[in-house]
């Protein structure tokens, strides 16, 4: 019979609860370990294991004594220190090992793991055991990428930090994974910001950075086009190359060599090389065209030691309209275009670099692709989602040419990137490229109207990084659940929801038939002829746009309140995008209200009852016009701050002038409305709507 004395009963009860607590702990721990953690990119193979506590800090070992491996260890340690995790001899051991070292071979053998042939260039194995955490790779690149995954698998901070126990085998689907950044239509980043870009690209396993130059690279042989303060110097380029090397990022410069050269060809010294006067296309038949190209690329090759140079050659719209008109009539547009690319290839052959070019010719003259040199690389570009991307890729693959794919972050001409379009475009195009055997991906950023902020683009950049590393069709929904936690350290999920709200705001405008939240809408005067037409279309969407933008602002504020967020500049840029979206819609609402209210006051000015309220209503209308001045003024300050966090002052005044013009417009209109009120007080008459610049018919 059991002993049920009071003392023993107490012991039994304590034992029961301890056992229950232990069972609950084991159950929760086991449940937690079955949850695949958020990772960008997602690894190919993942198995959960028991978590490792980092209560005593870490001790990182890279015994190969290789310079690159030592850098990977230092980079990892710096990241962990930012989380309050100390370096200590008593801490959890982290081993960064090469697979051909005795320690690496032993670690793999004990776990019955291996690196197969596809893993050798950039792949890695990562696993935890009772002895610590191991990253084993064949190359410095693989070891570095494994260390980047280690960073993402840490939860908590300081003494509460832990490492997600696991086994990972991972390697990329595409050899080259990059970002193409427009440095020629407005923003020119500072060297320090470019270094930040390199660090962040590498953290998400991107290995190519392609700066785009029209006239913004400084050349000793041709110094005129590159404006001081608005261009990249040789010294900056050399510093960036050196900085990128240990991060395993290759810089692939693009210098337009055919089209998009307006800011070169407007100089008198180069005017004779233009296809048409003050145009943008270099005339192939001019004797000075090829020497100019050779001078540019010879200097580029001396500064950028990577295996690739990008010659651009897209959108040569003026070809055949000027100096080559007769030749194009005789031979055809495609033949003249292809011939010039072949001549550029021959001229630059002594540089021993592979030439990338934009794949326009496949869209326009697919039959001529076979005439191109086979060692050139076609960069097929397209920025919309499609059911099939074969027409952009097949002409090159059928001709035996190597291809890269170039989707886009859809930032251009927008107050915030349209990620509805961008993510679907990347998902489909990158998967199609992998299927077609494309070796690379360049995710494009364009600044067509000069208002782009790079900090707004990280959402699309990270999805492109994931989709080019991961095989097949990448899951957009999974990425959207992971982004905020991985990029910003946001455990609340609020920033993920804020991104979705901004996507919904874009979608509301698309449904209304006004494309999406374009910069042009932000600047458009609702009382202009175009503005009145747009106001009719946009009116049904305005409330939905504002509710989504304001929801995003609320979620951003909540995420900030919850704790320390990483990448605060990107959070600020998201807030700016949301505020500009909200104001865009508010502007159309307010402008329509002013029109409708003034027309009603004007029509009823002889009504005895209505006359009692004219002065007060006119005072209110003047204030409503100043609301629009205030909206432009507030976002002006936010935009300027965001710009200067990443860019040189060059070009900023052009955007500030847009803000100042918009503010002045509504200041003048407010003053006219105030004057109309004064006229009423003095004479009890009102000026006509036309005399105040108010449209006759209210925007409906």
Where in this protein do the model-derived segments appear?
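Secreted/periplasmic carbohydrate-active enzymes, especially glycoside hydrolases
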Residues: 3-5, 84, 143-144, 152, ...
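Hydrophobic h-region of N-terminal signal peptides that target proteins for export
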Residues: 22-32
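Feature activates predominantly on carbohydrate-active enzymes
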Residues: 113, 117-349, 356, 405-407, ...
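Bacterial N-terminal signal peptides that target proteins for export
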Residues: 2-21
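Contiguous, structured surface segment used for ligand recognition
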Residues: 33-177, 428, 451
């Amino acid at each position: 019979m059991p002993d049920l004395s009071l003392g023993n009963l107490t012991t039994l009860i304590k034992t029961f609860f301890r056992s229950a607590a232990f069972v609950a702990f084991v159950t929760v721990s086991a449940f937690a370990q079955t949850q695949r953690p958020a990772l960008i990119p997602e690894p190919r193979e993942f198995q959960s294991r028991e978590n490792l506590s980092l209560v005593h800090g870490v001790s990182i070992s890279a015994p190969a004594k290789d310079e690159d491996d030592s850098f990977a260890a230092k980079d990892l340690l710096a990241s962990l220190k930012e989380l309050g995790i100390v370096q200590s001899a008593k801490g959890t051991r982290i081993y960064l090992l090469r697979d051909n070292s005795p320690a690496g071979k032993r670690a793999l053998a004990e776990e019955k793991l291996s690196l197969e042939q596809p893993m050798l260039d950039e792949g890695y194995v990562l696993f935890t055991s009772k002895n610590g955490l191991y990253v084993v790779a064949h190359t410095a690149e693989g070891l570095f990428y494994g260390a980047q995954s280690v960073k993402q698998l840490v939860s908590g901070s300081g003494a509460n930090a832990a490492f997600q126990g696991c086994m990972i085998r991972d390697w990329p689907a595409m050899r080259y994974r990059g970002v193409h950044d427009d440095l020629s239509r407005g923003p020119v980043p500072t060297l320090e910001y470019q270094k930040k870009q390199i660090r962040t690209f590498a953290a998400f396993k991107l290995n190519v950075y392609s700066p785009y130059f029209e006239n913004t690279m400084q050349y000793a042989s041709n110094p005129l086009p590159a404006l001081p303060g608005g261009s990249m110097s040789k010294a900056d380029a050399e510093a960036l190359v050196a900085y990128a090397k240990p991060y395993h990022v290759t810089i692939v410069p693009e210098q337009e060599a055919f089209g998009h050269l307006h800011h070169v060809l407007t100089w008198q010294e180069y005017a004779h090389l233009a296809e048409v006067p003050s145009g943008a296309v270099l005339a192939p038949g001019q004797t000075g065209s090829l020497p100019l190209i050779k001078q540019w690329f010879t200097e580029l090759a001396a500064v950028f030691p990577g295996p690739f140079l990008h010659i651009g050659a897209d959108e040569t719209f003026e070809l055949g309209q000027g100096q080559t008109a007769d030749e194009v009539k005789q031979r055809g547009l495609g033949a003249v275009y292809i011939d010039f690319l072949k001549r550029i290839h021959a001229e630059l052959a002594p540089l021993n670099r592979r030439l990338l070019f934009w794949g326009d010719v496949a869209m326009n003259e697919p039959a001529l692709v076979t005439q191109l040199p086979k060692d050139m690389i076609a960069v097929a570009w397209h920025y919309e989602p499609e059911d099939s991307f074969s027409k952009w890729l097949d002409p090159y693959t059928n001709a035996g040419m190597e291809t890269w794919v170039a989707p886009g972050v859809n930032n251009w001409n927008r107050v915030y990137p349209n990620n509805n379009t961008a993510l679907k475009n990347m998902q489909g195009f990158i998967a199609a490229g992998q299927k077609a055997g494309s070796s690379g991906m360049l995710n494009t950023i364009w600044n067509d109207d000069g208002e782009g902020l790079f900090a707004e683009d990280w959402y699309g950049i990270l999805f492109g990084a994931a989709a080019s590393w991961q095989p097949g069709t990448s899951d957009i929904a999974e990425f959207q659940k992971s982004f905020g936690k991985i990029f910003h350290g946001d455990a609340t999920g609020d920033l993920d929801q804020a991104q979705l709200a901004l996507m919904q705001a874009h979608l509301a405008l698309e449904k209304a038939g006004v494309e999406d939240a374009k910069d042009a809408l932000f600047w458009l005067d609702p009382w202009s002829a175009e503005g009145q037409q747009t106001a009719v279309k946009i009116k049904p969407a305005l409330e939905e746009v504002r509710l989504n933008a304001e929801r995003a602002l609320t979620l951003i504020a909540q995420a900030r309140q919850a704790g320390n967020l990483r990448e605060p500049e990107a959070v600020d840029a998201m807030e700016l995008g949301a505020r500009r979206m909200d104001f865009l819609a508010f502007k159309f609402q307010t402008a329509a209200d002013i029109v409708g209210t003034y027309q009603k006051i004007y029509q009823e000015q002889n009504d005895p009852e209505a006359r009692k309220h004219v002065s007060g209503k006119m005072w209110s209308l003047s204030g409503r016009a100043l609301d629009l001045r205030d909206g432009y003024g507030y976002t002006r300050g936010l935009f300027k701050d965001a710009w200067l966090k990443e860019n040189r002052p060059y070009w900023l005044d052009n955007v500030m002038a847009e803000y100042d013009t918009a503010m002045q417009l509504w200041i003048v209109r407010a003053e006219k409305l105030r004057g109309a009120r004064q006229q009423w007080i003095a004479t009890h008459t009102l000026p006509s709507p036309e005399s105040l610049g108010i449209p006759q018919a209210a925007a409906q």
